[in-house]
Amino acid sequence: MRLVLLFVLLLPVCLATRFHQKGLFDFMIEDEGSADMAPTDDPVISGFGPVCPFRCQCHLRVVQCSDLGLERVPKDLPPDTTLLDLQNNKITEIKEGDFKNLKNLHALILVNNKISKISPAAFAPLKKLERLYLSKNNLKELPENMPKSLQEIRAHENEISKLRKAVFNGLNQVIVLELGTNPLKSSGIENGAFQGMKRLSYIRIADTNITSIPKGLPPSLTELHLDGNKISKIDAEGLSGLTNLAKLGLSFNSISSVENGSLNNVPHLRELHLNNNELVRVPSGLGEHKYIQVVYLHNNKIASIGINDFCPLGYNTKKATYSGVSLFSNPVQYWEIQPSAFRCIHERSAVQIGNYK
């Protein structure tokens, strides 16, 4: 009789549909009727493994607790967690001990909460954390004592008004830094704040109130995005030392001049975005630049194009040909431009002119 009863109890388990994960955030079991399961106030226990916080989904060391209206970080998170997703909740504070025992965590997603305070010791246990996403919160400053293992920090759409050098000290592994859409001013960026970030390759400080290129940017930088700010001019000092820079975004500012020699400081530049500014002429130095391929100058006040503005005086001195030059929505008339001004551009479709109103 006991054997029959045991067989009856085990039969549903044997016939259960297997879970097939299709992607990193695919946590739903494709099983008909699974949505009819009654919720429980008890934590979910999977086999003999760690407890999964109530209402969260746990699989393959990924813990997803997003879109649950949480007001604090769940307790008793599985210690083997490598990715913790807490986005789209109502968390206001990150406290010391919230991430205790999560020594294997690689990615922490805290996007779109109401976080205004982070304890200086909150991230202390996270010795292996590589990606920290803090965007769309209420932070006034970046937290101190961020893990030295970090490679990516994203904190756009906060209330950050200061960037202190001490915050970035020791963050030698950071490659990506995103700080756009914050009430940040040039005076709020401490001189040399980013110098200690020896591997920093990508930085975006767009849609803020800065009026100049931050000083002391590391030479490792390959992409610098400063679009949508209040920068009025580019001087040579602002680009000094950026010998590895390949992409520079300065669109939607108020730039009226680019100092002579500025582009000499970025010898490996390939893309220059200066559209939607107040330029009255093509920046000097483009003709002599060997590697630049894309130049966006549309929506400015350029009234004339010089014969040597884009191409060098001699032939075969430019190592890379242009793949895109945009000049539309400028006062210059296309019939006033000498054809030889584009003599180093092999594809006619690479040049866009006209449509000025």
Swiss-Prot record:
GO terms for cellular component: extracellular space. SMART domains: LRR_BAC (SM00364), LRR_SD22 (SM00365), LRR_TYP (SM00369), LRRNT (SM00013). Glycans are attached at residues 46, 209, 260. Residues 17-30 form a propeptide. Keywords: Disulfide bond, Extracellular matrix, Glycoprotein, Leucine-rich repeat, Proteoglycan, Repeat, Secreted, Signal. It is found in: Secreted, Extracellular space, Extracellular matrix. LRR repeats lie at residues 71-91, 92-115, 116-139, 140-160, 161-184, 185-210, 211-231, 232-255, 256-279, 280-302, 303-332, 333-357. Residues 1-16 form the signal peptide. InterPro entries: Leu-rich_rpt, Leu-rich_rpt_typical-subtyp, LRR_dom_sf, LRRNT, SLRP, SLRP_I_decor/aspor/byglycan. The attached glycosaminoglycan chain can be either chondroitin sulfate or dermatan sulfate depending upon the tissue of origin. Its main location: secreted. Binds to type I and type II collagen, to fibronectin and TGF-beta. Forms a ternary complex with MFAP2 and ELN. Belongs to the small leucine-rich proteoglycan (SLRP) family. SLRP class I subfamily. PANTHER family: AGAP008170-PA, DECORIN. This is Decorin. It comes from Gallus gallus (Chicken).
